[in-house]
Amino acid sequence: MMIQIQDWELSQKIIVVDEINHGTVQVEVPKPGPYKDEYYQFADCAIYNLWVDEKYRKQGSARLLMETAEVEAKKLGCKSVQLEWDDKGSKPFVLEWYQRLGYRIKARNENGRLLLVKEI
């Protein structure tokens, strides 16, 4: 597992890459200030861009990526993490999978996507 922490002007980004199982996930941890707006009203950071190559799916790779991302986010001070899910770009079993990982539906955003939050 390769983990990279990037320091941007308004946030820190965690990039987790599973080179063996061909997957990746990213976390954004906003720095204090005006950028930390209403998007982060329910959590300290956001997980996004979870992806595993199709031929490596359903083998635990995505779970390992998510767990690693959560651990790294916690190291940067996050106590909760959020992610978005929508039925246009993702199948219902993915929402159920997030819920099995401990994510709970918190709200629906202005784009119609569900906002899920987990305490870490």
Task: Show which residues each predicted segment covers.
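Acetyl-CoA-dependent GNAT
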Residues: 1-48, 108-109
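Active-site/acyl-donor-binding loops of N-acyltransferases
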Residues: 108-120
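Conserved GNAT acetyl-CoA-binding A-motif
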Residues: 73-87
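Residue-level recognition of the GNAT/N-acetyltransferase active site
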Residues: 48, 53, 86
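Conserved acetyl-CoA-binding loop-helix of GNAT-fold acetyltransferases
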Residues: 52, 58-71, 96, 100
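Conserved active-site alpha-helix within GNAT-family acetyltransferase domains
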Residues: 87-108
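Short coil/turn motifs at secondary-structure junctions
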Residues: 30-32, 55, 88
